[in-house]
Amino acid sequence: RLKSSWLYSFLRKPIPVRTWIKVKMPTFAFSDKEVADLTAYFEAMSPGAEYEASVHVGKDNAIAQKGAAMVTYMDCGRCHDDGDKGIEFSLASQRLRQDWIPKWLKNTRAMIPWTTMPSHWVKDGDNYKVPTKYDEIKTIGDVDTQVNTIKDLIVAYNTAELDFDASLGEEGGDDEGGSDDEGDDEDEDE
């Protein structure tokens, strides 16, 4: 799930990733060759991990902006903005492989059962569906489009100009199907 370039940098100089965990990665006095060998080892142990040639290709800013509106609507920043409970988006952008992000978003608890991150899409047989609580994200498209939109946001997070005050459903819409009362009160006060 990690980019080799990020892993190499991390092994050279560890930084806090999960700030809410009290255990810290020790700093070893690895030589450049040892770090390269360790990175190559982890890469070899990751089946199907290939160099992401497209990692430096810019993402469509409009799609990344839809992702920003989605994570604002879903209140992802409650955990990810300052890294208190979830990894900051700016760090996720640097360390996570693009192909891994949609798998993680759809299968969060199946992939890592002990994670504190909730599963936002409900598995229904072989398909995923949007829970009523987040009904408004259906305006983005089907579940695959939704998770890929968030993936594009994460990948572009450190390079795109994003407005996290933008909202979903600009075309108007009803709150039927799951907006919580807090969101309704905010709309009435505006």
Language-model segments: which ranges?
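Sequence/structural segment immediately N-terminal to covalent heme-attachment motifs in c-type
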Residues: K59-D82, D142-Q146, E190
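Long, acidic low-complexity intrinsically disordered regions
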Residues: D174-E190
